[in-house]
Amino acid sequence: FFKQKTAYEISLGLVGSEMCIRDRMKTVTKSLKKFKHIPIILDPVMISKSGDYLLKSDSINFFVKNILPGSFLVTPNLHEASIITKMKKIKTKKDIEECFNKFTKLGASNVLIKGGHSEDKNKSIDYLSFNNKIYTISGKRYATSNTHGTGCTLSAAISGNIALGMNLLDATKNAKQFINMAIKNSFNIGKGYGPLNHFT
């Protein structure tokens, strides 16, 4: 693919079981080493919105040691950040700073901790560690259950913005605004967690 097309960024999401990771990601990682100039956006999908684990502990360890290092941006939610860094809680500013330090030691260049699962009922606050600074990016929290796929959509929007030439901070702010509108104008379809409106 890279011999025929020009890639401006690479996005990685749910990678499945450890066997799947070993079989497929070794091939991907080997290819990526030839294109280190291309930023990798890594969304470590480990826990579903309902709280179910999507990766087993051995798969998570393999993921952290072999996939996370070298990525340009990692976008965990609060639960995933807690699992990866082995922190019991991430609530205070001090917790956020400690969490970012742990991610740095694991090999992550930049990290966006998504606060959609926080206890704040009025705002959804994300924290971005970029160029050795911590930025707070907040958005209004809407009273809706139509939030299925918010994390995946956010990382995809950031990836698209980076491909368009935005720096990481602007790309993240723009993506956050897009997510807010997609949730605000979401669809009421079926039961449970409904879909966003990606065409907002």
Region roles according to the model:
Residues 56-134:
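Conserved phosphate/ATP/ADP-binding segment of small-molecule kinases
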Residues 169-200:
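Charged C-terminal helix
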Residues 4-21:
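Short, small-residue-biased leader/transition segments that mark boundaries at the very start
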